[in-house]
UniProtKB/Swiss-Prot annotation:
InterPro entries the UniProt entry points to: Enolase, Enolase-like_C_sf, Enolase-like_N, Enolase_C, Enolase_CS, Enolase_N
UniProt KW keywords: Cytoplasm, Glycolysis, Lyase, Magnesium, Metal-binding, Secreted
Full protein name: Enolase
Source organism of this protein record: Caldanaerobacter subterraneus subsp. tengcongensis (strain DSM 15242 / JCM 11007 / NBRC 100824 / MB4)
Entry-linked NCBIfam families: eno
Cofactor(s) needed by this chain: Mg(2+)
Enzyme's top EC category: lyase
Pathway assigned in UniProt: Carbohydrate degradation; glycolysis; pyruvate from D-glyceraldehyde 3-phosphate: step 4/5
C-alpha cells in the first residue's frame, strides 16, 4: 500500500463553459490519480452543495477558487500520509472535516474531486483498471445506454416541457452493437427533423432541441426515427422519459407545462403518464413527479410501478436517508446515481448497495455540465447496475464515456455481459 504525498486542485472548464474543479492525488509510489467534477442544470433541493465563489466580476460568479483553496489548504494537509486504498476512511475524514450535513463548508465539488482522484491513484498503483479496482473480479456487466436524443426543459432553449426523451437499445447483443444502434437512430432523427423543417441544434447533452407542437410529438418523431433506422420500437429499442417534474412544480401545488400551456394536478400527471405508457413503448420515467410530492409518488408507484421503471433523481439525490424513506413508503422502484449529488465515492456506493438490497434498479448518470472525465463509465461496470445515462452520441464530453465503455467491453472479452431487457429486473416486461 502507498500513502498520499500530495493533493492539488485547479480550476478548469466544463462542457457549458463554466468553471469546475479538477484534483490530482500523488502517492509515494509515484502513482497519480486525476478527477474532474461535473455540475447539474436542474438540481434537486436536497443535493450536496456545490461551492461557487459568487464573485460576479469573475466567471459571472461561478468560479470555484474557494473550492480549489479548500482542497489545497484544508483537505490536503488532513489526508497527506493516509493510505490511498483506505477509501472509506479517507471519505469519512473529509465528511468530518466539513462537518455539515450537505458539505456546504468545504463544498461537495471539492470533496468529490479528492475522493475520485484518490480511487484513481490507488487503482493506478495496483496496475488495475478503475472498474476492476472498485468492483473486483465480478465487475463484468456493461450497461444498457439510456441515450438522450431529444432535449427540452432546462437542457434546451425550446418549447418542449419534458426535459429528456431517451432511447434504450434493449435488443442489442452487446454494448458495442447497442452504441451503433443508438448512433444510427440519432442520425435518423436528424434526418426526420430536417424533413419536417425542424431545428437540429443540440442541447446541453447533445440531443436535438426542436420546437414541437406537443411533448407527444417528440415521442412520435423518435419512433419514426427508430423505424427509419431499421429497428422495431418496443423490441429492439424502447423509450425512457425524464420530465424533471420538480422544475414544472409551482407554488400552487400544480405542474405547469408552459410549452403546451397546460396545468396538471398530481392525479392528472399520473393519468398523463399512464396514457403515454399505454400508447408507446415507454419503460422508464424519471422524476415523473416533484421531489417533495411524496403522496403523489406513492400513488404513481401503485399505479405504474409493476410495469414501468420509476426513477427517483431529485427525489432521492443519491442520498441513503431519502432512499430509505422511499423504500419504506413504497415510493419509486429505481434510483438515479449522480456522484456529485452526494459528494463522495463511498456514499455513492452505499446508495447503490441499498437500492440493490431493496430490489430497486440503479442507473449511473452524468450531469448536464460534464468534462472529459470518464469515471462514471468505470463505476457503472464496477457496480454491475446495468444502466447508464450519459447523453447523446455527440459532444466529446458525452462520447468520452461511451468510448471508455467500448474499451472496457473489449478488455473483458468473453466475460463481458450485456443485460438488454434484463436491466429492468424488477418490472414485468
Amino acid at each position: 500500500m502507498s500513502s498520499i504525498i500530495d493533493i492539488y486542485a485547479r480550476e478548469i472548464l466544463d462542457s457549458r463553459g463554466n468553471p469546475t474543479i479538477e484534483v490530482e492525488v500523488e502517492l509515494d509510489s509515484g502513482a497519480v490519480g486525476r478527477a474532474a467534477v461535473p455540475s447539474g442544470a436542474s438540481t434537486g433541493a436536497f443535493e450536496a452543495i456545490e461551492l461557487r465563489d459568487g464573485d460576479k466580476s469573475r466567471y459571472l460568479g461561478k468560479g470555484v477558487l474557494k473550492a480549489v483553496q479548500n482542497v489545497n489548504d484544508i483537505i490536503a494537509p488532513e489526508l497527506i500520509g493516509m493510505e490511498a486504498q483506505d477509501q472509506v476512511a479517507i471519505d469519512k475524514a473529509m465528511i468530518e472535516l466539513d462537518g455539515t450535513p450537505n458539505k456546504s463548508k468545504l463544498g461537495a465539488n471539492a470533496i468529490l474531486g479528492v475522493s475520485l482522484a484518490v480511487a484513481k491513484a490507488a487503482a493506478e498503483e495496483l496496475g488495475l483498471p478503475l472498474y476492476q479496482y472498485l468492483g473486483g473480479v465480478n465487475a463484468k456487466t456493461l450497461p444498457v445506454p439510456m441515450m438522450n436524443i431529444l432535449n427540452g426543459g432546462k437542457h434546451a432553449d425550446n418549447n418542449v416541457d419534458i426535459q429528456e426523451f431517451m432511447i434504450m437499445p434493449v435488443g442489442a447483443p452487446n454494448f458495442k452493437e447497442a452504441l451503433r444502434m443508438c448512433s444510427e437512430v440519432y442520425h435518423s432523427l436528424k434526418n426526420v427533423l430536417h424533413s419536417k423543417g425542424l431545428s437540429t441544434t443540440v442541447g446541453d447533452e447533445g440531443g436535438f432541441a426542436p420546437n414541437l407542437t406537443s411533448n407527444e410529438e417528440a415521442i412520435k418523431v423518435i419512433l419514426e426515427a427508430i423505424e427509419k433506422a431499421g429497428y422495431v420500437p418496443g423490441e429492439d429499442i424502447v423509450l425512457a422519459l425524464d420530465p424533471a417534474a420538480t422544475e414544472m412544480y409551482k407554488e400552487d401545488g400544480k405542474y405547469h407545462f408552459e410549452g403546451e400551456g397546460i396545468v396538471r394536478t398530481s392525479e392528472e400527471m399520473i393519468e398523463f403518464w399512464e396514457q403515454l405508457v399505454s400508447k408507446y413503448p415507454i419503460v422508464s420515467i424519471e422524476d415523473g413527479l416533484a421531489e417533495e410530492d411524496w403522496n403523489g409518488w406513492k400513488l404513481l408507484t401503485e399505479r405504474l410501478g409493476k410495469k414501468v421503471q420509476l426513477v427517483g433523481d431529485d427525489l432521492f439525490v443519491t442520498n441513503t436517508e431519502r432512499l430509505s424513506k422511499g423504500i419504506n413508503m413504497g415510493v419509486a422502484n429505481s434510483i438515479l446515481i449522480k456522484l456529485n449529488q452526494i459528494g463522495t465515492l463511498t456514499e455513492t456506493l452505499d446508495a447503490i448497495e441499498m437500492a440493490k438490497r431493496a430490489g430497486y434498479t440503479a442507473i449511473v448518470s452524468h450531469r448536464s455540465g460534464e468534462t472529459e472525465d470518464t469515471t462514471i463509465a468505470d463505476l457503472v461496470v464496477a457496480t454491475n447496475v446495468g444502466q447508464i445515462k450519459t447523453g447523446a452520441p455527440a459532444r466529446t464530453d458525452r462520447v468520452a464515456k461511451y468510448n471508455q465503455l467500448l474499451r472496457i467491453e473489449e478488455a473483458l472479452g468473453s466475460v463481458a455481459q450485456y443485460p438488454g431487457k434484463n436491466a429492468f429486473y424488477n418490472i414485468r416486461k
